[in-house]
Amino acid sequence: MTRAKSGKISKNRHKKILKLAKGYRGRANSCFRVAIEKVEKALQYAYRDRRNRKRDFRGLWIQRINAAVREHGLVYSQFMGALKKTEIDIDRKVLAELAVNNSDGFVSIVEKAKAHI
């Protein structure tokens, strides 16, 4: 019985890793041993940062809302508390978008919130 080598399989596996490593510096884009380490680390970073992105955007929205609310004499925490009292259910993403792009709509929300402080 002849020996079955995994030539095609390993070549395809190497090709897949080297394709993912395209654009890396030095031997990381051409040497399989180095490339596999770099690709694995890059995938770990990607996994971690997909979760961190949600955290970062929430912080950005809060900063934008806080800056816009301070122009009207309120603080972020007071504003959010007042929104809860008035039962206005708008999430932070939409509030930040209103604060940046639709200041008239945001001002009307702030005025409604001010009435309940």
From Swiss-Prot:
GO biological process, one term: translation
GO molecular function: rRNA binding; structural constituent of ribosome
UniProt keyword terms in alphabetical order: Ribonucleoprotein, Ribosomal protein, RNA-binding, rRNA-binding
One Pfam family recorded for the sequence: Ribosomal_L20
Database matches in SUPFAM superfamilies: Ribosomal protein L20 (SSF74731)
GO cellular component, one term: ribosome
Residue stretches spanning the membrane: none
UniProt KW Ribonucleoprotein keyword: yes
Annotated coiled-coil segments of the chain: none
UniProt entry tagged with the keyword Nucleotidyltransferase: no
Function: Binds directly to 23S ribosomal RNA and is necessary for the in vitro assembly process of the 50S ribosomal subunit. It is not involved in the protein synthesizing functions of that subunit.
Family per similarity comment: Belongs to the bacterial ribosomal protein bL20 family.
HAMAP family associated with the record: Ribosomal_bL20 (MF_00382)
Name of the protein in its database record: Large ribosomal subunit protein bL20
